[in-house]
Amino acid sequence: MAEEAHGQEISLRVPGEMAYALVIRTALGGVAILKDLDVDQMDDLRAAADEACDCLLHQGRAVSAVQVKVKDGGSSLTVSLEAEYFGPRDTSCAVQTDVSRAVLETLIPRVALHCAEDGCVCRIDLTLLKAA
């Protein structure tokens, strides 16, 4: 994990396997502490990261890696998780996407799912407002 001194952006790239969601959860727990999120926000962020990984890794396409970027916006923190897909899509992803969106929106105030041309989610942005 590397932090840029000027942009306050943190990034992490892990293999595209669900086992590495634990690495993402652990890293985001550390980021939450560094960025002064409260315990509830940290728990919600970590749970949302699990759900986002599950969504990205079950889009009917093979995933080589998941890229996580954290951007500190001062009063907010945005975590983007993006799948690096390869190969053709095997199945429809609409059902998984709807379920994931519903779960994510119960955990995080602002959620954006970005789809590739084939309709599968390729990036999920999670934005939390920092406690004052």
Predicted features, each with a name:
Residues 38-63:
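Conserved ATP-binding N-box helix of the HATPase_c
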Residues 1-47, 91:
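Bergerat-fold GHKL ATPase/HATPase_c domain
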Residues 31, 49-53, 104:
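Long, contiguous hydrophobic alpha-helical segments, chiefly transmembrane helices and signal peptides
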Residues 1-11, 55-132:
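Conserved beta-strand-loop-beta-strand hairpin that lines the nucleotide-binding pocket
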